[in-house]
Every structure is written in structure tokens, then in C-alpha cells.
Regions:
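Extreme N-terminal segment that seeds HTH/winged-HTH DNA-binding domains in transcriptional regulators
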Residues: 1-35
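A short, conserved structural fragment
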Residues: 53-62
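C-terminal regulatory/oligomerization modules of transcriptional regulators
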Residues: 107-170, 193-194
Length: 194
């Protein structure tokens, strides 16, 4: 894909096409329906569809509609996965903003390493906060997740098991209280009772 602000528009179209694909995988989407879903004029949607088709992401047949190619399916799925992971992440931290809109902005900044890291620290979620299925990771991401899999939530510690704290997701005030009690990054802890 291209770089910069225009790439975000392409990403959004690919993500929306994947969303249509989730609902009806074999259906061609009319440009008018895509334009409506994207909140743009039909001419703008047609222009972007032609652009993405020329890059091999969409199969476009004038007056018949558009659908994802195999390459487009991979790309759209990746964008939707990153969006939904961002929503799960934003739901798990002290955040009062609009989760969906913020996730729309964050998804473009998530690369493979960050996607794998989010997968690990969020416990490989399968649903986003609204109950939508998070698409499965591709093989490259699964391999990275396997490399990073040394992180586990504290709640998974067995009785008598020790671990080192690697990250803490809490408001600064609560985090400070924990740190004053000795629970801080790199501290070794042991689960004594349930």
C-alpha cells in the first residue's frame, strides 16, 4: 500500500470490504452501498475501488459490484483484526474517550510486532468489546506470538509459582500504590494462596 494519510483511506476501505465479506463472503458489494458505509459520495467510492482493484486487492466489475481478492482478503482481515485488538486494548486501560474512533486511528500505527505484543498482553482475545469476532492472526503473527508467549497474566499463576512483573496496566494513582507495596516492574512475586 502507499504511505501516509492516503494509506489510511485505503486501509479504511479494505477494512470495510472485509466487514462486508464477514456478513456475506460470496456477495459482490455495490459501490453505492460501499459509499454509504464509508460516508462518501458514490464517485469517490468508485475512484477508490478502481485504485484498489489496480493494486490487486479488489475484483471490480462495473455495474456488478466489487469483492475482495485473496490478497485483499488477507489485507482487509489484518486491518479488521488490528482495529478490534485496539478496541480490546482501549477497553482494558483507564480510557474515557470514544473507543471505536480511537481504535480507527490506532489501527494504522499497529505493525506486526505491536499486533503480536497486543495479542500476548491481552491474552489472545477472540471477541472485541461489542462481541464481534476478532479475525485469527496470520502465520507470521502467530510465530511472533509464540516468541513473546513468555508473558502471562498474574491471575494465571499457580499456588507456589513465582514470576517477574513485566508490565502493569493501571491508572497512575493505583500503580503508585502498588509500587509502594513492592509491586513494580521487574519485581519477583510468588503466589502464596488463592
Amino acid at each position: 500500500m502507499s504511505t501516509g494519510h492516503f494509506q489510511e483511506f485505503e486501509d479504511e476501505y479494505m477494512e470495510m470490504m472485509y466487514q462486508f465479506h464477514e456478513k456475506s463472503p460470496s456477495t459482490r458489494i455495490r459501490n453505492r452501498d460501499l459509499a454509504e458505509a464509508m460516508g462518501v459520495k458514490p464517485a469517490s467510492a468508485t475512484e477508490m475501488v478502481q485504485r484498489l482493484a489496480s493494486k490487486g486487492f479488489l475484483d471490480y466489475k462495473p455495474y456488478k459490484g466489487v469483492r475482495l481478492t485473496d490478497t485483499g482478503l488477507i489485507y482487509g482481515k489484518r486491518m479488521k483484526r488490528r482495529h478490534r485488538l485496539a478496541e480490546v486494548f482501549l477497553s482494558s486501560i483507564p480510557f474515557r474517550g470514544n473507543i471505536h474512533r480511537t481504535a480507527c486511528r490506532l489501527e494504522h500505527a499497529i505493525n506486526d510486532d505491536l499486533e503480536a505484543s497486543l495479542t500476548v498482553i491481552l491474552g489472545n482475545p477472540v471477541l472485541d468489546p461489542s462481541g464481534q469476532v476478532i479475525p485469527e492472526a496470520d502465520e507470521k503473527i502467530r510465530d511472533l506470538v509464540d516468541q513473546y508467549q513468555t508473558f502471562h497474566p498474574l491471575g494465571e499463576l499457580e499456588l507456589g509459582e513465582s514470576a517477574q512483573i513485566e508490565c502493569i496496566f493501571l491508572e497512575e494513582k493505583v500503580k503508585s500504590s502498588l509500587e509502594s507495596a513492592g509491586l513494580k516492574i521487574e519485581a519477583i512475586i510468588r503466589r502464596e494462596n488463592s
